[in-house]
């Protein structure tokens, strides 16, 4: 609607109305839009009958829709009448468009467009003047690049407009004057700064100074997950981008992965021979002694000893079954043909992973006729997922079984291959099965008779329909489910026409036999309780598209049942729950109405539609998997609707994916919401929409006017329509205004010829509703494309929308909403949500588009931040925000901004506090601040969809604020490393960090608010628990990642090692200063007391000092508690719980109380036992080839520019550099600039110095372990061979100046010796993995060979300084980690582990002059310090061993939170050992 008053056009409207009274009836047929019929004058001699017909013409009402609905007088004021303003529904005041006023409307639109273009010209001139006045010449050059040309001039039409409206001479003179004024101002500012500038002026100059800084977002935040069968790209907006791009997390991952390699190698070498010694035959000979010569043991021990227990490197050939099947006929085991149940391998393969020792109580008898194989727990050939049965021999011995395999696929092999496929998805080192999680409900335990049917064989259409009749609920329950969907869930996916859909359901299922009653909105409400249990006996599919309608119905039944508030997950966060409660909805419903609603929900809970019903429908009726291989004849509008519903269902009810589809091969039990299958499905939906022509507005096709009344929504369906003579047209009278279309569909020639005016009017309504559905589907697909791009970080499919699409918004449909107010709200939401999508598109263009992201400027990101803040805080209307984006060149008009020229300004995004507190005082969502009287409350219209619409507004706020958090984080990580080189950037980094933290905490709070209110009665989130659960939890998880980054900064200090002290809070020496420990415990106790009073609803200040880490840790613990409870219902919560538990275990501060229990040097181990490989997380348990494909692993080991030589190179200056710091490859990421984090405070330095003194005391006891041999100036633990492992601290070599190195003392680098003392303890990643699987790695060798040649002089000087530092100069400021000097003697009460030496350490010792054998305990102590962060060794072992608390989730899951591919899954054997290159 245009906001321009219509007072000036009132006379013309009246005259046009009077002149149109006596028009010919022939001119009232459907005409093309904009046709001028005023020149056609009817004859004066017309009969009275014709005049009566003329009075029944389709007249457009002049009153607004709301006043007509309320049946009150409307004053017809534009844009909003007084009645709607008084009752608080001005945002819904809607006038139907007059067809004869379209020409005048076009003139008004032209004036508005010219006005907006003039404003844009002014904005562009201001931007150009700012650019030309910039003191930096480089920035001027950058603005002349082709990528930035469209930023200022837009497209060609706007360039022409600039030339037409502004003279070139005046413009040049004006810009010249502005440029001179700007230069004078800059000179004055320089003079004032040189004299004595105050803080405000310096802050302003800093802001102006860095406005034209360029950021390259194509490197740090792009991920490429290299799988064995391909690659997956994940962009900057993906949830893993922070995991990969943050500098602290990169170093942490390097530290963790190196620890993982060491522990994995140690444990592997330790147990490889013990398994061989403890191996026993799986046959219990005590029960069946092989006494006779022919009764020998059926186990082929030669194959057993060579293939089943030996390490991987000794079994290059596929493993075969150890059972000699030729012995079955000798009497040991009865012949297979005697008993059908014996056609299985008699060996329990679960014993293979336990050292071939079967449990005594579970040892099967060889004479047993029971099948004893358990393929759910083990596969015969894990690396290749190969069946252990020799099919060649099996085919010869049992040809009959193989001959019948076509009819019964299960008879091909006695092994259940389905369970093997599930097991094959595990890592190579694990033998656990992927558990089949229980569905989101607990009622899947009940079994339909149809569910026990095997659907492997082909089923006819009649069999499928008969099975579906058994699965579907009774008729009355189906009608209740449909009403619940359209009342609560429909605004989330409004692509259906409610009236038409109910009409189809009546025809297909005969729901109209239930004598429904009609409520105020024209919706059928079943009222007969006697027919409650009337089942579905027949499903009629008269048209081909009805199969898709049936599939949509099944999805609606399933989604609505899952969304019932009683089915939502119970969340109990203890005392903190009260902080996240919001007022309940104030309801005007009576007690009887509430009781009736409760009864309806209890009835619906009893009838769950199984997910197998959808599988049958989409596989046998719709054949959805074959649509991509069939011509467009199978695609119609209903097919597109089903595909959208199917995509929506997969994302919302992800727990059903394990049952519904097996197409995902990501190696995880749950593919998650960032699965590539969703991405491919959306591309198919987009192409189907193009095939149907949805990208063109339906008004462009006049033939639709003659086609739609005959075929309704199946206009593109070329199939023949089945006859259905039993269909009664009168059954649809209560369903819709277009119900009489069914009579015209029977082939009435009179209705199609237009002789019946009633039918003509209803046909016209049907046409408009069809066009309306057309537009809704298209813009919903556009919204899906934007949301997927935001979630995955992938480019949008529908870019520059207006270049190929002219489809109008649904608000352009000429529909009378007086009988369907719900649809009016849907139309308003479509316009608003599309405008919000335009704001998101502007951000995505600058982050994901390579042409812009490679050289995006700071002031552009600042403009995006300011505009998004204005939108979410309600200080600026969404129309103004979109207009500002276009005027500033941040959003091209080709994206669709010009289509919103006639939008209603009052219908905008309400403020978030108004959304949450709406139910407290019964205030309207869009109230203008005035007090509402009781009479106004009585007059207020009871609006449907209000709570659901506000829940959607809530999700939009979360999305916008997540973008604000991401933009601030990008700018923060860009300017934080520049602090040492340019101190002016410290202020910017601090501001961006605080803003990022504020928006991260906002997302965290909103996530908690949602899950704490989903089960409340009359809550804001009624029936939205399934739809909004993942978006809310995902935003909370993203916020937690920034919390982890800040905790690392708060605890670690500067990355370069400046002013940090390598201390271990709990040492092995008795000389350790216990007062420091007591102070740490006291500080921790005080901080815990403060946390009890912590208000989770308040923002966190970065200046909180020492308590910052504790405050943020408390939020992590609460989120972990939340995900632990949600993981029982939602599979995607398991991954987030693992991620949170991982960091909680890692970052937990060690305490004296917990460490002193074990005492002595074994304090760190406690009751810890060596972690089993099967308990490791996937990204820690994988081998080298798997980890190399993980983007996080790639950047973790390549982040700090490595230097060194390969294993065959000679030592340099008496020592060799480790592999992680030995290669200076050109493809590596640039080094980190020396900087200190914004959370680093003076109090941190004070505590570090105090604990450094205590460390100096410990240092005296360990000086003797340095070998000061003149030929080998190598500290203890340094290997002459290089290693790829990262040390616990990796300071940047280039950050130290030559003056510090040549001075002989380095007082500010206390952790310098960590580089030398800890590198040797970390093993070579390549050596470890090579010893395990014997894979050559020539790429690594070449990198080693070229690394020394690329070493910089600074690196050589730095390492020379290391080798010449005498032990006497080591003091409190420059000391060795206690781990690096741990003694080799075992403690008096040490565990058995302390007597074990690392095999890698033995290898190092045999080739080292120091002859040192570090044990595992020394290694753990050595790596307990990560850049000043004191990691509890017990927590470190727990993390590296995998966060797998049996009391946490109640089961062992293979779901991981890092994308580590698995070589065991099916179809990847060809890529195994393919030496895939590592790409950036």
From Swiss-Prot:
Subunit relationships: Binds DNA as a homodimer. Interacts with SRO9 and YDJ1. In the absence of heme, binds to at least four cellular proteins, including YDJ1 and SRO9, forming a high-molecular-weight complex (HMC) which results in repression of its activity and dictates its DNA-binding specificity.
Binding site for Zn(2+) 2: 64, 81, 84, 93
Additional note from the record: Heme is an effector molecule for CYP1/HAP1. The HRM repeat region mediates heme induction by masking the DNA-binding domain in the absence of inducer.
Keyword Transmembrane helix annotated: no
Database matches in CDD domains: fungal_TF_MHR (cd12148), GAL4 (cd00067), ZIP_Hap1 (cd14655)
InterPro entries for this protein: bZIP_sf (IPR046347), Fungal_TF_Env_Response (IPR051430), Transcription_factor_dom_fun (IPR007219), Zn2-C6_fun-type_DNA-bd_sf (IPR036864), Zn2Cys6_DnaBD (IPR001138)
DNA-binding region per UniProt: 64-93
Subcellular location: Nucleus
SMART domains linked to this entry: Fungal_trans (SM00906), GAL4 (SM00066)
Name of the gene encoding the protein in the UniProt record: HAP1
Positions annotated to bind Zn(2+) 1: 64, 67, 74, 81
Protein name, as recorded: Heme-responsive zinc finger transcription factor HAP1
Compositionally biased tracts (Low complexity): 130-142, 177-208, 732-756
Biased composition (Polar residues): 1-50, 143-152, 160-176, 429-444, 703-731, 1385-1408
Pfam families linked: Zn_clus
GO terms for biological process, alphabetical: DNA-templated transcription
GO molecular function, one term: DNA-binding transcription activator activity, RNA polymerase II-specific
Region Heme-responsive: start-end pairs: 244-441
Function statement: Regulation of oxygen dependent gene expression. It modulates the expression of Iso-1 (CYP1) and Iso-2 (CYP3) cytochrome c. In response to heme, promotes transcription of genes encoding functions required for respiration, controlling oxidative damage and repression of anaerobic genes. Binds to the sequence 5'-CGGNNNTNNCGG-3'. Is non-functional in terms of iso-1 cytochrome c expression in strain S288c and its derivatives.
HRM repeat residue intervals: 280-285, 296-301, 320-325, 344-349, 386-391, 412-417, 1189-1194
Recorded GO CC terms: nucleus
Coiled-coil regions, chain positions: 105-134
Disordered: annotated segments: 1-56, 126-208, 429-456, 703-764, 1381-1408
Record key words, sorted: Activator, Coiled coil, DNA-binding, Heme, Iron, Metal-binding, Nucleus, Repeat, Transcription, Transcription regulation, Zinc
